[in-house]
Design a protein with these regions (language model features):
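Adenosyl-5′-phosphate
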Residues: 8-222
Length: 222
């Protein structure tokens, strides 16, 4: 397997060039400069230069690793897997009374894979290289080497269609603006840029909508 952003060819090239910074940036929903643009001046002062991706960068810089791929995979094991994908699998399976098991999480298999040379884990732009080779003869080629099919939702279209009012409402939410964290004009521009088709801000708007819903339900504890 390769870390999440390495599934994009451009990010693999970026990792080869600039390591931890490139990988951390690829994981972010918003680039640092885009985040800064929507924060209020007071919030920017309070952050004092802190970046949300700093824990990931620190993990990579301190990883017991031989190269950039090792550092990225180490950070995935410590940060992205437990904090994102495994949590989602656990919660969604338990919500429907299923007990999920991830066989590839066996610690002996993980240790074996971590010890493989980088060119046995990623070959050119192809991830999961060793696993695919190992399964040849067991799985047919059209299954083993078919293009990945992700679980992508059409949120960009939603926010330009049936959810455009929800996007505007989130950008103008009193719950969010009362925190003092955001620049109101910047949030409105972000929503209108997306709705008009000038830019794709779907992921940022989704995060904003989820934050608004969460704070409305749970209250502002900031």
């Amino acid at each position: 397997w390769a870390p999440r952003p390495l599934r994009a060819k451009s990010t693999l090239r970026a990792l080869a060039l600039s390591g931890d910074e490139a990988y951390a940036r690829a994981l972010c929903v918003m680039a640092p400069d885009a985040r800064s643009a929507i924060f209020s001046k007071a919030m920017t002062r309070e952050l004092g230069g802190y970046r949300a991706e700093q824990p990931l960068i620190d993990l990579m810089r301190n990883a017991p690793a031989r190269n950039g791929l090792d550092r990225a995979q180490y950070a995935d094991l410590k940060f992205w897997l437990p904090g994102d994908i495994l949590t989602k699998v656990d919660r969604t399976s338990m919500a429907v009374s299923l007990e999920a098991r991830e066989p590839l999480l066996d610690h002996r298999l993980v240790e074996f894979a971590a010890g493989l040379p980088h060119n046995r884990r990623v070959s050119g732009m192809e991830g999961k290289f060793a696993m695919k080779r190992a399964m040849e003869g067991t799985l047919p080629g059209e299954i083993l080497y078919r293009a990945k099919q992700g679980f992508v939702l059409p949120i960009a279209q939603w926010f330009r269609g049936e959810l455009k009012d929800a996007a505007r409402a989130a950008a103008r939410s009193e719950t969010l603006l009362d925190t003092g964290w955001f620049d109101a004009d910047a949030l409105s521009r972000m929503a209108e840029d997306h709705i008009s088709g000038r830019r794709d801000r779907a992921r940022e708007l989704w995060q904003l909508l989820m934050l608004d819903r969460s704070m409305s339900l749970l209250g502002n504890t900031a």
